[in-house]
Amino acid sequence: KATIKPQSVKDVFVRMLTLYAGMADVLAQTGDKSLQPALDSIWNNIVDMRMHITGGLGAIHGIEGFGPEYVLPNKDAYNETCAAVGNVMFNYRMFLTKKDARYVDVAEVALYNNVLAGVNLDGNKFFYVNPLEADARNAFNQGLKGRSPWFGTACCPSNIARLIPQIPGMMYAHTDNDIYCTFYAGTSTVVPLSDGKVTIKQTTNYPFDESVRF
């Protein structure tokens, strides 16, 4: 019952984002509209008052939690990689409930600017913490000045490994009669609609080139 009427987000961001994503799943699967006002309130509070420009979430180090509204520091931001993963998952599920592009816009921001920044190109070193400002002198990343090959609490590497393989399955969504492109990437797929199957091919070098061709 405590989840039905929240006005703002509190507590540990990863735990809360997982709860909110689950609420959105319940709404999408059951059509329980009693959850919608709470989810809308939560989403607006996060995006309007607590999200960094990178899609990162969480200003409080000690509890790995959401800070006060509009407290969005650069150097001292926490922005845990797990929270960015949760931001993608929550917003994708919100999109499935409403088919509103603003949700996948936020998911895209978090994916490109926070999730993917949490791992190096070789895939073997990680950020736990993602501040917006780093000077190579402050050991901001769990005692390190840069990415780490592992952590004592290794939730972030495993959450990246959990999300990335799901992205191909999140590229498109559909109803009986409508197809939605949720992320831009070079892809091809076959979408089953009520009147038959539709083959889609998307050609793009996004985000390095904003040209997208279907």
Tell where the protein language model's regions lie, with residue ranges:
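Glycan-recognition and catalytic cores of secretory/periplasmic carbohydrate-active enzymes
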Residues: 1-214
